[in-house]
Design a protein with these regions (language model features):
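Polytopic transmembrane helical bundles with strong interfacial aromatic enrichment
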Residues: 1-189
């Protein structure tokens, strides 16, 4: 099983190289000018980031299984049940965190961080007018979710706030459960 997993991780790493080349190639299709620097496609940048996230997650998961396999036989039934519950409770937060990271690819790809580099407001607005326009008619403006500078920046910020709240929720759940010391430490990080 480990050999198959490592082979899969190697294949992911190799494909990451090809995706990186594909991403960079998108920035070289149009020559740079004084007014327009070289930029890569936000879609390709986010694909490259997603593959890196998948590869990192796979390597981390594999390493954790090798270094610290969890043995439910050495803990009470209540601790084992609480550990399984906490793992399930943490999944939505993990998904939100990953979506937040991937939305950062669109922020970087659209260079939205340079346009809206104030906090907590976005320049002078809590919600820029372009965001309201996009969400009021999403059927016609759906591409703005990925290509509009104010929209990708606003979405990334809202996802980041949601990530923080979900992390606090997992922390609150973990504090109230009987867990192994290692599991408690991991949950409270």
């Amino acid at each position: 099983a480990l050999c198959a997993r490592l082979t899969g991780l190697f294949a992911l790493g190799a494909s990451q190289g090809f995706i990186g080349w594909w991403m960079v190639k998108s920035g070289l299709e149009e020559p740079a000018t004084k007014d327009r620097p070289i930029t890569v496609s936000p879609y390709r940048l986010t694909t490259h980031l997603a593959m890196a996230l998948a590869l990192y997650s796979g390597v981390l998961w594999t390493a954790m299984n090798i270094l610290r396999p969890y043995d439910f036989l050495n803990v009470s039934t209540a601790v084992a049940k609480n550990t399984r519950f906490l793992k399930k409770a943490a999944i939505p937060g993990l998904v939100i965190s990953m979506i937040t990271v991937l939305s950062g690819g669109f922020v970087a790809g659209n260079q939205a961080g340079f346009a809206y580099n104030t906090w907590p407001k976005m320049l002078d607005d809590w919600v820029p007018p372009e965001v309201i326009t996009t969400y009021s008619n999403l059927r016609e403006n759906y591409k703005n979710l990925f290509m509009s500078t104010p929209v990708v920046q606003f979405d990334h910020r809202m996802l980041a706030y949601t990530t923080v709240l979900s992390s606090w929720a997992v922390y609150g759940i973990a504090r109230g459960l009987e867990l192994t010391p290692a599991c408690r430490k991991a949950a409270l990080l």
